[in-house]
């Protein structure tokens, strides 16, 4: 075998031009196998967290429940009894505080992510807590219409951007609650509408900053009837920021993260991207390449871009692995 010299030549008018090579593609079998390993990791991790910490947290239990619900809708053998038990415990945890005899709700985004984990088919234990969540969201909404997570992740000097991210997540949860207008009390529905209106006013004129998740959330909200209907622009920008290895970083120009890549896969598929979409294929290949043997992904804390550049622990890996798993599952057919 020998090397051919490289030639630069003009293409004659009408000449056939070879199509650009397709990105490497994973089979459904490979994706299901990776997702299966990841689900096993998430279940074991959240069970240990529940037993040891007796806490839901924003990162551990909600994303296990969310991933298991996505898996169940795609034909995975999910232990429904265990899932129902975990769901009931998590929603009860976020609605009560047995030691103090009062309702708490936990951290704000814990409640938000639990609502989103039930998208489309909430269980009875979730539905009965939804009216309380509405009052909780109303109580926590700031005067300017935004929400702010108690343990907020933000870049230095970027509080407004972080508030917008937290607010967009909450808007998605409000929209999920609004889908159940036939089962929720009228006062709850009125409260949701008022909170929704104030949040939209806060986000009016918001501009993208450094964070990729801001852009992903903006694209998803726009797709789901956002205040500024420009889904094509937001999605196009999100696609343009995909790294050469197929992933997305936490901030523009940063190295790829399984956490953010899973979020972006979720958004792309929710906005209609199909499994053969080049951006989807590249992201799937990135996640398959970076998955550990135990089914998890190594994920640095988002505080790594602020004050904790070396932080990587079981919480950050579980949270990122949850998103990576959800992203992979979204590329598989339902049924």
Label every PLM stretch briefly.
Residues 10-335:
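Preference for long, amphipathic alpha-helical scaffolds in soluble/luminal domains
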Residues 1-10:
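Bacterial N-terminal signal peptides
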């Amino acid at each position: 075998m020998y090397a051919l010299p490289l030639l630069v030549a003009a293409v004659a008018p009408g000449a056939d031009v070879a199509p650009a090579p397709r990105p490497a593609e994973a089979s459904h079998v490979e994706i299901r196998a990776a997702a299966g390993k990841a689900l096993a990791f998430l279940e074991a991790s959240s069970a240990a967290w529940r037993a040891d910490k007796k806490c839901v947290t924003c990162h551990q239990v909600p994303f296990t429940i969310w991933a298991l619900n996505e898996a169940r809708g795609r034909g995975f053998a999910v232990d429904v009894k265990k899932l129902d038990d975990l769901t009931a415990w998590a929603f009860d945890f976020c609605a009560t505080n047995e030691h103090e005899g009062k309702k708490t709700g936990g951290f704000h985004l814990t409640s938000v992510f639990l609502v989103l984990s039930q998208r489309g088919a909430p269980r009875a234990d979730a539905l009965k807590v939804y009216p309380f969540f509405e009052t909780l969201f109303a109580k926590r909404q700031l005067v300017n219409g935004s929400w702010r997570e108690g343990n907020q992740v933000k870049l230095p000097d970027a509080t407004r951007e972080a508030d917008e991210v937290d607010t967009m997540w909450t808007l998605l949860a409000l929209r999920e609650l609004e889908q159940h207008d036939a089962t929720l009390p009228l006062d709850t529905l009125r409260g949701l509408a008022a909170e929704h209106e104030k949040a939209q006013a806060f986000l009016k004129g918001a501009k993208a900053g450094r964070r990729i998740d801001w852009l992903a959330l903006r694209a998803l909200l726009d797709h789901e009837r956002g205040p500024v209907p420009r889904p094509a622009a937001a999605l196009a920008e999100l696609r343009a920021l995909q790294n050469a290895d197929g992933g997305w970083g936490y901030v523009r120009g940063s190295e790829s993260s399984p956490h953010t890549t899973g979020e972006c896969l979720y958004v792309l598929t929710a906005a209609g991207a199909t499994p053969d979409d080049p951006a989807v294929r590249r992201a799937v290949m990135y996640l398959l390449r970076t998955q550990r043997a135990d089914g998890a992904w190594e994920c640095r804390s988002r505080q790594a871009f602020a004050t904790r550049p070396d932080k990587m622990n079981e919480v950050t890996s579980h949270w990122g692995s949850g998103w990576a798993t959800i992203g992979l599952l979204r590329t598989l057919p339902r049924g």
